[in-house]
């Protein structure tokens, strides 16, 4: 076994021990026993909301314990196999094991990042909103590119489920706005640092003179609320509009005014839903979205970051950019908060975002 491999294995053992402490494995086992006792109670379903939350927490703890156990076993087994292959001078076997070691290293690093998700809503599902900036067709097309990027990131790289809650098509191409519901373990924790303005520089495919254009779109991520939360919304503070849900080219999703748009006047937050044919269901979905947005603001207040949250929400422009995507005259995607850069723009636009997210989370931790 060469010295470099020894160092990697030593560091991975340290990382697994750090993960053990951060996850507080012993405490999780104790909590699991407590929940099991509550679940076994005959009065469990007298409060259905509480019962569902308990069962979800139980499932999350079981998954966390299982993943950590598998990670520990994989590392122990790999160390043993590497030591045997090194002792017997099996070079081909060592090459295969080194490839496995790299894959395990990535998995352990990802788990270390997940351990940094200490916010009270980091484990929740989330709403990811995309809104095109000024610029019409150019910005609408950029917003559509971001929709594809985030959908692939969620579904392919994290195996999250993605549901389109609301989508407004552009007049010629692309989208004016779209709201995604991203569902999965730590969905909000992974997505929350994407809130901000994203800038694209490229040769426009819509310009006959092939001139360079700059487009903007903003992303806003808020946690989905689980159970009841103390968010007070006064009916007199709401402006509720109904409209027909429709797509590009006049292709109506349905012919009745079932889509709902709610404006929260004090905060100027606007939410809308057209995912259902039922106006009642769309209103309930929109109200849940509004609560999530207001909850996000409360979380930001606790972290003394309210100004950043509202500035991002209210402004699209140079001042609040978090990431620049340059396709011409050179190719580079750069995060302006951390300085992290990636030259493989195709990979990033195809959903390979984790290096940016990890850099930002690590920088903030």
Swiss-Prot record:
Entries under Pfam families matching the protein: PCRF, RF-1
Post-translational modification (record): Methylated by PrmC. Methylation increases the termination efficiency of RF2.
Presence of the UniProt keyword Lyase in the record = no
Could you state a single Gene Ontology molecular function term? translation release factor activity, codon specific
Keywords from the UniProt entry:
Cytoplasm, Methylation, Protein biosynthesis
Primary location class: cytoplasm
- Report the residues modified as N5-methylglutamine: 251
Residue ranges spanning the membrane: these are none
- Look up keyword Cell inner membrane and say if it applies: no
Where would you find this protein in the cell?
A: Cytoplasm
User: Which GO cellular component terms, listed alphabetically, does the Swiss-Prot or TrEMBL entry include?
Assistant: cytoplasm
Entries under InterPro entries matching the protein: PCRF, Pep_chain_release_fac_I, Pep_chain_release_fac_I_sf, PrfB
Report the superkingdom from the record. Bacteria
Q: What does this protein do?
A: Peptide chain release factor 2 directs the termination of translation in response to the peptide chain termination codons UGA and UAA.
Protein family per UniProt = Belongs to the prokaryotic/mitochondrial release factor family.
Q: Which PANTHER family match?
A: CLASS I PEPTIDE CHAIN RELEASE FACTOR (PTHR43116:SF3), PEPTIDE CHAIN RELEASE FACTOR 2 (PTHR43116)
Q: What is the name listed in the Swiss-Prot or TrEMBL entry for this protein?
A: Peptide chain release factor 2
This chain's source organism reads Neorickettsia sennetsu (strain ATCC VR-367 / Miyayama) (Ehrlichia sennetsu)
Please state the gene responsible for encoding this protein.
prfB
């Amino acid at each position: 076994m060469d010295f470099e491999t020894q160092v990697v294995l030593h560091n991975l053992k340290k990382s697994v021990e750090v993960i053990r402490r951060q996850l507080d494995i012993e405490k999780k086992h104790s909590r699991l026993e407590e929940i099991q006792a509550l679940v076994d109670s005959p009065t469990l379903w007298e409060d259905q909301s509480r019962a569902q939350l308990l069962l979800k927490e139980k499932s999350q703890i079981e998954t966390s314990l299982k993943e950590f156990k598998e990670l520990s076993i994989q590392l122990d087994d790999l160390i043993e196999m590497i030591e045997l292959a090194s002792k017997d001078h099996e070079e081909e076997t060592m090459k295969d094991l080194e490839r496995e070691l790299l894959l395990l290293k990535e998995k352990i690093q990802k788990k270390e990042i997940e351990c940094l998700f200490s916010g009270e809503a980091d484990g929740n599902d989330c709403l990811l909103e995309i809104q095109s900036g000024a610029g019409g067709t150019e910005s609408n097309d950029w917003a559509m590119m971001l929709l594809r990027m985030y959908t692939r990131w969620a579904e392919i790289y994290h195996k999250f489920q993605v549901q389109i809650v609301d989508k407004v098509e552009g007049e010629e191409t692309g989208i004016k706005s779209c709201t995604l519901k991203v569902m999965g373990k730590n969905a909000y924790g992974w997505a929350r640092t994407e809130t901000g303005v994203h800038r694209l520089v490229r040769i426009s495919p819509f310009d006959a003179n092939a001139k360079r254009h700059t487009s903007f779109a903003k992303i806003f991520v808020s946690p989905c609320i689980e159970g009841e939360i103390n968010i007070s919304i006064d009916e007199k503070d709401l402006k509720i509009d109904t409209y027909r849900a429709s797509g590009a080219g006049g292709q109506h999703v349905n012919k009745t005014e079932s889509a709902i748009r709610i404006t929260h006047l004090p905060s100027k937050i606007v939410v809308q839903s057209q995912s259902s044919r039922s106006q009642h269901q769309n209103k309930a979905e929109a109200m849940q979205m509004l609560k999530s947005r207001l909850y996000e603001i409360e979380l930001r207040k606790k972290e003394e970051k309210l100004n950043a949250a509202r500035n991002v929400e209210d402004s699209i422009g140079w001042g609040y950019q978090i990431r620049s995507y340059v396709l011409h005259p050179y190719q580079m995607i750069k995060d302006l908060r951390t300085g992290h850069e990636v030259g493989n723009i195709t990979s990033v636009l195809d959903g390979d975002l984790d290096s940016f997210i990890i850099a930002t989370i690590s920088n903030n931790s």
